[in-house]
């Protein structure tokens, strides 16, 4: 590295800096720039970076440490655009520590809350608030991509935005799909995006889109999917997983997809594992589920009570729990601020790879 600072020592120092500081250190010399851009350094930096949760509620973004001390202090993030560009309908996706946010003018914004960099993705031409969206990395072409399916008449067309070219392209057309989706937000794993889709209660499946080949296929859901009220896709232990909530049984089930395409159930929890007897005056439902870097489970519940003697603001209650898979124990995550408007939660880790590909 230099006669004054060995490369090993420089790496030990640089991996402890923030992304904002690293952006400045890139300008010190060509050697440091090449080191910071090196894939090996990028992986080391990601592995050593602490994980934080990013949440979206009350039309603002916050950084949380769900696994740290309680009560959790919410640190408001500086949104880079005018606050009027987002509202309750805003859709948020994430990949490699970077968020993809829908804006009210039908454009998208890719934003890294760690480096504070952002980029506007133009409207693909025809956009609806119901279009499914995905954001992920294509390792074959070393490029990040945004995917949306646009339905017109009897055809669903996949449009892909490539950051390498800075433009949208039409990739494939599916005739007469008549598909509906559990959640418009796609789940990213390896080089694939996944959505839960259905035509009817008897025809349910997972839509899988390959970011490298721009091809799609249909994957089966778990065979015991009947009776499920809500379901969410996620990633745990580098495997695609599905969390299912069966309201009649008040049961949460989590299964992972094996390489063979079959499903293996890994967790089954009853509502009583989280909600105390005193709190059961509320009718709690699972609102959404997230996984931590340690493969623990973060479950958010919304409870309803229509008792006429209660004030309107008291009839709805939100609770969040951290379920630790190692010792099979759950603990309530308490916040300094109320959770009434919480709509999105994902774990983000600072990583240089996406910054090096999108923002430079």
Curated annotation (Swiss-Prot):
Against PROSITE patterns, the record matches this protein to: FBOX
* Domain of life (superkingdom): Eukaryota
- Annotated F-box domain ranges read 1-48
A Pfam entry, by short name: F-box
CDD domains from the entry? F-box_AtFBW1-like
Name the UniProt record assigns to this protein: Putative F-box protein At3g16210
């Amino acid at each position: 590295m230099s006669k004054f600072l060995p490369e090993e020592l420089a790496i030990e120092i640089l991996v402890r800096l923030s992304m904002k500081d690293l952006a400045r250190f890139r300008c010190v010399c060509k050697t440091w720039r090449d080191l910071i851009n090196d894939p090996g350094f990028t992986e080391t930096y990601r592995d050593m970076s602490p994980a934080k949760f990013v949440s979206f509620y009350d039309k603002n973004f916050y950084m949380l440490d769900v696994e740290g001390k309680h009560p959790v202090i919410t640190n408001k993030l500086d949104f880079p655009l005018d606050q009027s560009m987002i509202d309750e309908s805003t859709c948020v996706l994430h990949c490699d520590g970077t968020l993809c946010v829908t804006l009210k003018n039908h454009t998208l914004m890719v934003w890294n809350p760690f480096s504070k960099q952002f980029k506007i993705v133009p409207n693909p031409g025809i956009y609806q608030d119901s279009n499914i969206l995905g954001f992920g990395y294509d390792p074959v072409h070393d490029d990040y991509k945004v995917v949306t399916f646009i339905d017109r008449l009897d055809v669903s067309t996949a449009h892909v935005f490539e950051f390498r070219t800075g433009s949208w392209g039409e990739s494939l057309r599916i005739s007469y799909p008549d598909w509906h989706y559990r959640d418009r937000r796609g789940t990213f794993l390896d080089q694939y995006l996944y959505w839960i889709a259905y035509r009817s209660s008897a025809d349910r499946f997972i839509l899988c889109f390959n970011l490298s080949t721009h091809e799609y296929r249909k994957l089966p859901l778990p065979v015991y999917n009947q009776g499920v009220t809500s379901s969410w896709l996620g990633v745990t232990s580098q495997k695609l997983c599905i969390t299912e909530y069966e309201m009649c049984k008040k049961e949460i089930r989590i299964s992972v997809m094996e390489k063979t395409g079959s499903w293996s159930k890994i967790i089954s929890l009853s509502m009583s594992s989280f909600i105390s007897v005193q709190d059961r005056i509320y009718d709690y439902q699972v609102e959404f589920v997230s996984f931590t870097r340690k493969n623990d489970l973060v479950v958010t519940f919304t409870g309803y009570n229509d008792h006429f003697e209660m004030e309107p603001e008291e009839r709805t209650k939100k609770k969040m729990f951290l379920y630790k898979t190692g010792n099979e124990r759950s603990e309530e995550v308490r916040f300094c601020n109320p959770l009434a408007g919480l709509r999105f939660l994902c774990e983000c880790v600072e990583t240089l790879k996406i910054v090096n590909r999108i923002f430079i």
